[in-house]
């Protein structure tokens, strides 16, 4: 039996790579083919573009939300972590869904490597570079799909 508030492993999730200017969004399910990048949401001085997030939420109707937890390579906190945790709490309050945090170390590097491979194969163009944030979110979702027990339920 899953922990109360946990995301069911066969549920659809939205994943988020939280940055100071943009938030990458991806969708994934264990029953599908992993995860895919779906949106890049702008962050303004007043906070994220909640109207855009509401549209993504309405389109995908997730069972849970996975937010990248930025740690340093030596497990130390970094300033971005406070922002990611605050965003995760806002998501939980707004959508009343379970929210988990998953280690996102090197997810942007992995996303950049994927992007470079896809560009070399002719599947991506340079102007698609903004989509890198959403690709990092897809990496985060894939990590959760591969090891949901490694996630931390947002307290």
Curated annotation (Swiss-Prot):
EC number(s) recorded for this UniProt protein: 3.1.-.-
Pfam families given in the database record: RuvX
Catalytic EC class: hydrolase
SUPFAM superfamilies named in the record: Ribonuclease H-like (SSF53098)
Gene Ontology MF terms: nuclease activity
Location (main, coarse): cytoplasm
UniProt-listed Gene3D superfamilies: YqgF/RNase H-like domain (3.30.420.140)
Keyword Oxidoreductase: no
A cellular-component GO term for this protein: cytosol
The entry's keywords: Cytoplasm, Hydrolase, Nuclease, Ribosome biogenesis
Gene Ontology terms: biological process: rRNA 5'-end processing
SMART domains reported for this sequence: YqgFc
Location in or out of the cell: Cytoplasm
Family affiliation: Belongs to the YqgF nuclease family.
Record-linked PANTHER family: POLYNUCLEOTIDYL TRANSFERASE, RIBONUCLEASE H-LIKE SUPERFAMILY PROTEIN (PTHR33317:SF4)
Role according to the record: Could be a nuclease involved in processing of the 5'-end of pre-16S rRNA.
Protein name: Putative pre-16S rRNA nuclease
Organism of this sequence: Xanthomonas oryzae pv. oryzae (strain KACC10331 / KXO85)
């Amino acid at each position: 039996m899953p922990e109360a508030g946990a995301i069911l492993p066969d549920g659809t999730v939205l994943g988020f790579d939280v940055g100071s200017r943009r938030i990458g969004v991806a969708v994934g399910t264990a029953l599908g083919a992993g995860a895919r990048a779906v949106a890049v949401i702008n962050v303004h001085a007043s906070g994220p573009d909640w109207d855009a997030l509401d549209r993504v939420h309405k389109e995908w109707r997730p069972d849970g939300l996975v937010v990248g937890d930025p740690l340093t390579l030596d497990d130390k906190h970094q300033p971005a972590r406070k922002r990611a945790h605050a965003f995760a709490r806002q998501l939980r309050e707004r959508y009343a869904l379970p929210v988990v945090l998953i280690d996102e170390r090197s997810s942007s590097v992995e996303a950049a490597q994927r992007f470079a491979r896809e560009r070399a194969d002719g599947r991506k163009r340079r102007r698609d570079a903004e989509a890198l944030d959403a690709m990092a979110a897809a990496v985060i979702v894939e990590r959760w799909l591969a090891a949901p027990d490694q996630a931390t339920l947002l307290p």
